[in-house]
A protein has these predicted regions:
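Short SAM/SAH-binding signature in class I
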Residues: 15-17, 31-40
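Conserved beta-strand signature within the Rossmann-like core of class I S-adenosyl-L-methionine
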Residues: 35-37, 64-72
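A short glycine-rich, Lys/Arg-flanked "PGG" loop and its adjoining helix->strand segment in the class I
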Residues: 48-65
Length: 134
């Protein structure tokens, strides 16, 4: 497990792969992420990947306009991501997958320089309480 970084395109693109407890790993990051690909299987097979806490961490770490895509098309995932600020849509899937989800964060929460991570997280606590994915 752990964090695995791959630099591409003369180091102008940074790909960060996370292997482990997703909410804990995201909670330890400070970043401004432009694009997400969530490959965590369907909520029925990997429920830890699709929690309100994970959605809140994704929103906290996202830059304004951040794009997000995932193979799952589950309504609970779509609604959970929408509750933390993503505009999500069902799209045509890939291969045998009929539908998938894609979207973007309308506007990232701005924080003053030096703001502690715990204070940053509190901005999403209200959304976290509303979210009820399976």
């Amino acid at each position: 497990g752990g964090y695995h970084e791959i630099l591409l395109d003369n180091r102008s693109v940074r790909l960060l792969l996370l292997y482990g407890d997703v909410e804990k790993m995201l909670g330890n990051l400070l970043a401004s992420i432009d694009a997400w690909f969530l490959d965590g299987f369907a909520p029925a097979k990997n429920s830890d990947m699709w929690t309100c806490g994970v959605f809140a961490e994704i929103a906290r770490l996202s830059a304004s306009g951040a794009r997000l895509a995932t193979f799952t098309s589950a309504g609970d995932v779509r609604r959970g991501l929408m509750e933390v600020g993503f505009a999500m849509q069902k799209r045509s899937g890939f291969g045998a997958k009929r539908e998938s989800l894609a979207g973007a964060l309308a506007e990232a929460q701005e924080y003053p320089q030096g703001t502690r991570r715990s204070a940053r997280r509190s901005a999403y606590r209200t959304a976290d309480r509303r979210c009820h994915p399976a």
